A protein has these predicted regions:
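Conserved catalytic-core motifs of eukaryotic protein kinase domains, centered on the activation segment
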Residues: 6-7, 31-37, 98-99
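Flexible "cap/lid" loop of the alpha/beta hydrolase fold
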Residues: 85-116
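Active-site loop/oxyanion-hole signature of alpha/beta-hydrolase fold enzymes
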Residues: 22-64
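Conserved hydrolase catalytic core segment
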Residues: 59-97
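Conserved HGGG/HGGXW glycine-rich cap/lid loop of the alpha/beta-hydrolase fold
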Residues: 1-30
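Helix-loop "lid/cap" segments that line or gate small-molecule binding pockets
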Residues: 124-138, 146-152, 163-169
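Conserved small/polar residues in nucleotide/adenosyl-binding loops
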Residues: 177-178
Length: 178
């Protein structure tokens, strides 16, 4: 959901040969916050596609992780002439054939009121990043604070809740539009 996760990889890329663009999902970074109801897969795909077209990119080698998989590849499917290659990690493109939750926390946040209590009052998802994203020793307290700063300081935890609720949990997830 944030290019910040790949900051160390980006630092090592040869800037004389590649242009690195690391967008953060709309509403989650330092961008303007949007209503929770606007966090839909189609909206995010459209917003990223608009950015890609505005930048007039070609020969894009896209790297996407988590929601960056369906959002980025969905955006590029609207402008396939841009895409040269892709590196995709820890992501999904199709809804599961059977009902299943990704994690216990994903199952709990789908419950109205309980989800709001967990994500907005009791549980800071950013504090768990070191445990679930890569090498735990690479996440200092300062990095964890910086990663969560745009959402936590704005009071926009509904964005995190919306994105967690969008995770496909069966053949007809709410995040997919037919």
């Amino acid at each position: 959901t944030s290019g910040f996760l790949y900051r160390k990889v980006a630092e090592r890329l040869p800037r004389d040969r590649v242009r690195v663009i690391m967008p953060t999902t709309v509403g989650l970074g330092f961008s303007s916050k949007i209503p929770a109801s606007d966090h839909t897969l189609n909206n995010h795909i459209g917003w990223i596609n608009t950015v890609l077209k505005e930048l007039e990119l070609n020969e894009v080698i896209y790297a996407g992780q988590d929601w960056g998989g369906p959002i980025g590849m969905g955006a590029l499917s609207l402008s396939p002439e841009m895409l040269k290659g892709a590196v995709l990690m820890n992501t999904v493109f199709n809804a599961p054939k059977e009902k299943a939750d990704l994690t216990t926390m994903h199952a709990r946040v789908k419950t109205p009121i309980l989800g709001e209590l967990l994500v907005e009052l009791l549980f800071n998802p950013f504090e768990q990043l070191a445990r679930v994203q890569g090498d735990p020793s690479s996440w200092s307290d300062d990095v964890i604070r910086l990663y969560g700063k745009p959402v936590l300081e704005s009071g926009n935890s509904k964005a995190i809740l919306s994105m967690m609720r969008m995770v496909p949990d069966g053949p007809d997830p709410v995040s997919y539009t037919h």
